[in-house]
Structures are given as structure tokens and as C-alpha cells.
Amino acid sequence: MSVEQSLLGKETQYPTSYQPDVLFPIARAQSREKYAHIEGITQGKDWWHVFEISWLNAHGIPQVAIGRITLPASSPNLIESKSLKLYFNSLNFTQFDSTQSFIETVEKDLSAAAGAKVELTLFQVDDLEISKPQGICIDDLMPERLEQHPDATLLKLDESGEEIEVELYSHLLRSNCPVTGQPDWGTVFIRFKGKKPCYRSLLAYIISYRQHNGFHEQCVEQIFADIWQNLQPEKLMVYATYTRRGGLDINPCRVSDLTWMPKPIRLARQ
């Protein structure tokens, strides 16, 4: 299905009965065509936090939880966010014999839409803790050049030629939803092993996404691909934690080496 057929940006009725068919898959293949040769584009996970989950237990009593969805980056489809919100709303008045039954139903439906195994972990509403970012924040540096659209020529190696392993992060990631034009805000983590990158050039590159139209997953994959091609690290991880919209936040992570997969976190802006 094409994104133009999705419910994004359209007025919709919120379902009050279980409707798995509201889930809208979007094929990853088209946005990945130019990166097909790059190692790591399909390695990683998309983590979603769902803050508006509710269903009825066997006695008809409402239950609430926070959910973490784990979607493999190798899945043929991602799931459009508004359709996911509508899907979870459709479960609000549905009875389940147990919490496990609820989890299994959601995993079955999301796996069918994604075309791969999707996992759901539930947290009590007070249990999903806020983490502090680890690594070196590059936000106070002064870039040499600023652009308003992604420009891979901004990426440079440090003149020292030093070999390093480092984790950097920036809170300045901003892009736009390609359908609604609404701004998406995020923190991006970059773990890098190889010749030292110029940190100022990395910040300039991240800032260059401010007027870019792209889904969260596509932005992370483009960042990964541009760094991989232009800076040629031995190993690379790119992980973005986006702020919440409509009760959901999306957190894509791509890695060149699966041993570099981080644990999912929730930051203060989420």
C-alpha cells in the first residue's frame, strides 16, 4: 500500500470494537532502493512506546499499561502510526481472559501487518523509567556550514586521522512527517568505530534534516547510509529516540554489527 492511501492527515472515526484490519502496512523497499548495497540498513529494530493501551479483563474491568513494540528492521513493512493508534483504540472495549491473551492477540495482528514477528512488552504505568543519554553531546559545537536539507557532503573526518571508538549524541534532530508536514523531534545517538569523524561536521549534518520530509525509520536509515558511505567506519550504530505524538513514540535503530544493538531507552522528552 502507498502512504497516500493511509489515514494520516485525514479525519477519521475512532473504532469502539476490535478492528485489526485498520492496521496500515507501508513497504520499506522503495525508500531502501538506493541503500540496498549498504550493510546494516536492514539490521536493527524499531521500538515503539505506546502510552495509550487499555482493554477489558475477564470481568469487564478496564486495564491500562504502557507497551513497547519491537519490530525487526528486516521486516518487509513498517506500520503507519495513525493506524496503529486506531488499532489500539479498537481494543479499549474488548474483553480478554488474561493479559497474556491480550499480548498474543496484538502480536499476531502486528506481525501480520509487518510481515515479520513483532513482540509486545507491557509495563505498569509507573515502571517505564526515564534514562539519561550516555556518550558525548555535540550540541554546543559550532558547525562550519549550515544547510536545511540533508547534505552528505557536510560529513568529514577529523584531520588527526586518529582511530577511535566513540558514542555521540545530539538533541537537535528535526524532520517533517512526509504526509502531514508536522515536525518530528528526536535525539540521535551515533556509535562509531574507525577513523575519528569531525564532530562539528556530524552536528551540521544532523541539523540539515530540519526541513526534510521523511518517516522516522527512513531518516535513521539515510543517516546510517550517509555516514557509512562518507566516513567509512569499521562499525556503526545509529539510534534515534523521537518525541511522542498521538500517544506513540518511534525509536529506530540500525547497526552494522548486531553485537552493537543497544537496549531500548526512554528519554525525558518522551
UniProtKB/Swiss-Prot annotation:
Annotated function: Catalyzes the NADPH-dependent reduction of 7-cyano-7-deazaguanine (preQ0) to 7-aminomethyl-7-deazaguanine (preQ1).
Pathway: tRNA modification; tRNA-queuosine biosynthesis
Binding site for substrate: I79, E80, S81, H216, E217
Gene Ontology terms: cellular component: cytoplasm
Gene Ontology annotations of biological process type: queuosine biosynthetic process; tRNA modification
UniProt family annotation: Belongs to the GTP cyclohydrolase I family. QueF type 2 subfamily.
Catalysed reactions, semicolon-separated: 7-aminomethyl-7-carbaguanine + 2 NADP(+) = 7-cyano-7-deazaguanine + 2 NADPH + 3 H(+)
HAMAP family: QueF_type2
NCBIfam families linked to this entry: QueF
Gene: queF
Gene3D superfamilies: 3.30.1130.10
Binding, NADPH: S81, K82, R245, G246
Any one GO MF annotation of this record: preQ1 synthase activity
Subcellular location: Cytoplasm
UniProt entry keywords in alphabetical sequence: Cytoplasm, NADP, Oxidoreductase, Queuosine biosynthesis
UniProt-recorded name of the protein: NADPH-dependent 7-cyano-7-deazaguanine reductase
InterPro entries in the cross-refs: GTP-CH-I_C/QueF (IPR043133), NADPH_dep_7-cyano-7-deazaG_red (IPR050084), QueF (IPR029500), QueF_N (IPR029139), QueF_type2 (IPR016428)
This enzyme's EC code(s): 1.7.1.13
Active site per the UniProt annotation: C177 (thioimide intermediate), D184 (proton donor)
Pfam family, one: QueF_N
Highest taxon above the source species: Bacteria
